[in-house]
């Protein structure tokens, strides 16, 4: 597809999204309210969203992929409150299982296409799974969540270097890790 046609299609998708879908800020507002004052969860989702948005922008994602990525970054830990109550922890597998279902209901009134909701649900349902990464949105979500978790939890330099060298694929994500952790 030539660059002019691609640019035109991106503009059409963006115009449709602005008219019919919740904005990223509206999803953020809804997710913050859903978090019910849990400052740790709110700070984490904002941090992951910021890294995901930055990496996506720097990697030059098309408008639809960027939108799906940002919504997934905001909602990726939607199941944490339920997992704390139901299982007594926020184990990644429980988050993935519960989150994929929960995010569909959460986004049901946001005007997103079925394809967008399905992709967000897939990303939320796999955000702790580092194998079988099937798209740039998935890769960036994994990278953004890792950077946030590593900074919040004080991961060792060795752990960060290992993740960067074995899991990270985007140059922008690698550059952020190097800057954040002074590598």
Describe each region flagged by the PLM.
Residues 23-47, 79-89:
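Active-site flanking loop/helix segments enriched in acidic
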Residues 44, 48, 68-69, 95, ...:
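Generic hydrophobic secondary-structure packing signal
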Residues 111-118:
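Short secondary-structure capping/junction motifs at helix and strand boundaries
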Residues 66-88, 99, 121-128, 145:
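His-Asp-centered metal-binding catalytic motifs of divalent-metal-dependent phosphohydrolases/nucleases
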Residues 1-18, 33-46, 50-62, 75, ...:
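Divalent metal-dependent phosphate-bond-processing catalytic cores, especially two-metal-ion Mg2+/Mn2+ enzymes
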Residues 48-51, 93-109:
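An active-site-proximal "capping" alpha-helix that borders the catalytic cofactor pocket
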Residues 63-65, 116:
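Membrane-helix interface segments
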């Amino acid at each position: 597809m030539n660059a002019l046609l691609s640019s035109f299609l991106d503009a059409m998708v963006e115009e449709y999204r602005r008219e019919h879908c919740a904005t990223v800020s509206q999803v953020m507002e809804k997710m913050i309210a859903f978090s019910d004052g849990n400052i740790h969860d709110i700070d984490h989702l904002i941090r992951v969203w910021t890294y995901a948005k930055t990496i996506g922008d720097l990697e030059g994602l098309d408008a639809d992929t960027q939108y799906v990525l940002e919504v997934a970054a905001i909602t990726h830990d939607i199941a944490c409150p339920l997992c704390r109550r139901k299982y007594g922890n926020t184990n990644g597998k429980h988050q993935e299982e519960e989150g994929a279902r929960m995010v569909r209901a959460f986004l049901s009134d946001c005007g997103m296409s079925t394809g967008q909701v399905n992709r967000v649900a897939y990303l939320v349902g796999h955000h702790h799974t580092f194998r079988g990464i099937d798209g740039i949105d998935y890769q960036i979500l994994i990278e953004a969540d890792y950077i946030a978790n590593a900074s919040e939890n004080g991961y060792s330099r060795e752990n960060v270097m290992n993740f960067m060298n074995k899991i990270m694929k985007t140059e922008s994500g690698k550059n952020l890790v190097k800057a954040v952790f002074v590598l």
